A protein has these predicted regions:
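Glycine-centered hinge/linker elements that transmit conformational signals in sensory
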Residues: 246, 284-367, 411-414, 423
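Bacterial N-terminal signal peptides that target proteins for export
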Residues: 2-10
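Conserved C-terminal helix/tail region of periplasmic/extracytoplasmic solute-binding proteins
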Residues: 329, 478-479, 494-589
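Hinge/lid segment of periplasmic solute-binding proteins
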Residues: 114-186, 191-192, 196-214, 220, ...
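Conserved N-terminal structural module of periplasmic/extracytoplasmic solute-binding proteins
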Residues: 11, 22-127, 133-150, 191-192, ...
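Short helices/loops that flank or line small-molecule/ion binding pockets
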Residues: 97-111, 184-185, 229, 243-249, ...
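Extracytoplasmic/periplasmic substrate-recognition and gating elements
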Residues: 159-164, 226-230, 380-385, 403-493
Length: 589
């Protein structure tokens, strides 16, 4: 059942072509902080910064670095980095494309990219500047700790001294996710009731009889983690309960899911599949996807059953499975996990049952869908939004937060409560107290800053760039970043939670601290020497699949609308043993 794996070059090409649908934002914006370009003939030392056109630039988000650059420029206005020059001039641009193929001749000095930043590969070709001094400043001067997985990604090629030095710095991260409307869940009683609840609401639906909480007396179940008194209480603990919840929401006139619409928007659907996959699998064995293996066997799919279907949907056969211990010999089976198939199957079930909001069926932008989800529609309220965890600040900045203003006006001033959703950890039944699994987050959007090695040729410019990076990674500027955008950089800095000003990011901080977070980083050379083959963000290998020998670039949801099945996508996106052997050979070089 192994299909042709989507190779590195194709992954990169698709990542680039999908950038426009990623966050629907134009590239090439240029913002100088001074009065000139900082070129050789200018009166100031110039620093050119290029950001990936993404969540850190969208809807005015780029202001975080514009403001930081302005503060640094003011601080250094009287400092001379180069003979005959005084002060610095920082030019900030953003673009969909980071020019990896032409770094040696590119005019930018500092870059920020999501997911694809590959310090090992580009330090090996001597195109990146070593950043050990900045890392030392963060850890020794600022007394901060960088996340261990982030540090793995920051390491470059083995140098002449036999050491791997740092060539990148961690920036914001985001995970695959669903966001649920806490207000809606509370008002409509969409939480599962605890088994011995005195008051509850019984629902006899398509997937059996189930008890939900009484909104007036919410006695919630223990949720997917199997522990009472935690953030996931009352949320579906199994995919069976998730189906029961969606069926109940639809029976009450609501829409379980909303997602940016149309063929383009459905590329967001991988967020749902990968989030469910990680939650079902759990961190211990899910780490195999970055070649960090466990001795615990993994359940993998070997075929499909006749006459047995996924929650009765005759378009979705149940799989035949076996247990396998993954290692460098069997690592090609990492994408064969039964949990990945079940996640794909659940999205097909959602499509087959029309569990998507009507706006999903038209070519509706992310901004419009987010507005609908936040402000709500009395005629068709959406319970859950499918997107990465980056989405919230984009919505807050869009149209000056008009959706939140509308909510406040129509709700009588109630707090808008939206939250990252902990997802099911088992296939069927209900998780009993003490039997659940910790929430697993799949951080696929790790971004990094890195520096063009050309900067090293000019001692004055190198000092200016180094000082600017130290400034950005000071405690004060790290705090300013999060207090403005709400997003987190994987360093243990403090910030004023009150400045976040909303339920989503304050609750997310707690949820993240309680979760197992899996980042695309590893000590295994098969991973870090083949990074592009392990990327699971936008444009990653599993976003696409082969069907009848053709690479299909539509998103999962659009594929289901076009008649494809979970089985089609699953079998068309596994990793062949032959390709895996090539990756192993690359790791030995």
């Amino acid at each position: 059942m192994k299909s042709k794996f989507i190779k590195k070059a194709l992954c990169g090409a698709m990542a680039l072509c999908m950038s426009t649908t990623l966050i629907a934002c134009g590239g090439g914006n240029k913002t100088p902080t001074g009065g000139n370009s900082g070129g050789p003939s200018s009166a100031e030392t110039g620093i050119n910064v290029l950001l990936f056109t993404g969540t850190a630039t969208r809807n005015g988000a780029i202001k975080w670095i514009q403001d930081a650059a302005a503060r640094f420029t003011e601080l250094k206005k009287d400092e001379s980095y180069e003979s005959g020059k005084k002060g610095v001039d920082i030019t900030i641009q953003d673009n969909k494309l980071i020019p990896y193929d032409s770094l040696s001749s590119d005019g930018n000095d500092i870059y920020l990219d999501e997911a694809k930043a590959d310090m090992y590969t580009y330090s090996a070709s001597n195109e990146l500047m070593q950043l050990d001094e900045i890392v030392s400043y963060i850890e020794n001067d600022q007394k901060l700790t960088i996340d261990a997985d982030a540090k793995k990604r920051m390491l470059g090629y083995e140098s002449a001294d036999g050491q791997r030095h740092y060539y990148g710095l961690p920036q914001y991260e985001w995970s695959n996710s669903l966001t649920y409307d806490v207000n809606y869940f509370e008002d409509a009683g969409l939480y599962f009731a605890k088994p011995d609840a005195i008051k509850s609401v019984t629902y006899e639906g398509k997937y059996g009889t189930v008890k939900f909480v009484d909104p007036a007396d919410m006695q919630k179940s223990c949720g997917p983690d199997g522990a009472y008194g935690t953030s996931d209480d009352g949320l579906p603990s199994s995919l069976e309960e998730f189906a029961q919840l969606c069926d109940y929401i639809k029976s009450q006139g609501g829409s379980p899911f909303i997602i940016p619409g149309g063929a383009g928007g459905s590329v967001y659907s991988f967020h749902m599949v990968q989030a469910i996959w990680a939650a079902l699998e759990g961190a211990e064995t899910m780490k195999s996807i970055k070649a960090e293996y466990s001795e615990t066997p993994v359940e993998v799919v070997t075929g499909f059953k006749d006459g047995e279907y996924f929650f009765g949907d005759k378009n979705i056969p149940m799989p035949i499975t076996e247990k396998v211990v993954l290692n460098d010999t069997t690592g090609y089976k990492m994408y064969d996990m039964a949990s990945r198939y079940y996640a794909l199957a659940f999205m097909q079930l959602a499509n087959d049952n029309d569990w998507f909001h009507s706006e999903t069926k038209s070519d509706t932008s992310a901004d419009k869908v987010q507005t609908t989800f936040i402000a709500t529609n009395a005629n068709e309220r959406a319970a859950m939004y499918i997107d990465g965890t980056y989405w919230y600040h984009e919505a807050k900045l869009y149209n000056k937060g008009a959706a939140f203003t509308q909510w406040k006006r129509t709700s009588g001033g109630k707090e808008r409560k939206l939250s990252y959703m902990c997802l099911p950890t088992t296939l069927k039944g209900s998780v009993a107290e003490g039997e659940g699994k910790k929430n697993t987050m799949l951080n696929v959007g790790s971004s990094f800053m890195f520096v063009n090695n050309r900067v090293s040729e000019n001692a004055g410019k190198k000092k200016a760039v180094t000082d600017f990076l130290k400034f950005l990674y000071s405690k004060a500027e790290l705090a300013a970043f999060t207090e403005y955008l709400g997003m987190n950089i994987p360093i243990n800095y403090d910030y004023d939670e009150k400045k976040l000003g909303d339920y989503y990011y304050t609750s997310f901080k707690k949820l993240r601290s309680e979760a197992d977070v899996i980042t695309a980083a590893s000590d295994n050379p098969v991973q870090y020497k083949n990074l592009s083959s392990f990327i699971l963000g936008f444009g990653g290998a599993l976003n696409y699949y082969t069907y009848n020998g053709q690479v299909m670039m539509e998103g999962y949801l659009q594929a289901y609308r076009n008649g494809r099945t979970a089985k089609d996508i699953y079998t068309g996106s596994t990793l062949s043993e032959a390709i895996w052997k090539t990756l192993l050979e690359n790791a030995k070089k």
